[in-house]
Amino acid sequence: MKFLRYGIKGGEKPAVLDKNGKIRNLSSYVSDFGPENINLDTLAKLQKIDFETLPEISNLSRIGPCIVKPGKFVGIGLNYSDHAAETGAEVPTEPIVFMKATSCITGPNDNIVIPKNSKKTDWEVEIAFVVGK
């Protein structure tokens, strides 16, 4: 199952990508994908649905961030030796853990706002996943 959120910024709705590559609306089963409902109970409920019976989203204008109101955004720096080498840094012996503002999470095609006075913006992409109980 591949879940996503679609719609205007701040008004995203939950959806699923079905086995035929069509995006289907999940709003009648879950209000959104956020900390309060990303859990095993919700997943079990969603696994019972025949997604092909759900309304198809044909006028998809935007895919939003994967989750609404995440609690934390934890990053690991220089986690690839190639990236460390290209920055001229030593490969760390232990992970470099850092936090990022959750407001920086965007949809896959959203603009990325670079602060006006930024002097050292790194182009690297962060890979994220949601961890829960």
Where do the PLM segments sit?
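Glycine-enriched loop-and-adjacent helix/strand subsegments that border the catalytic/binding cleft
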Residues: 70-133
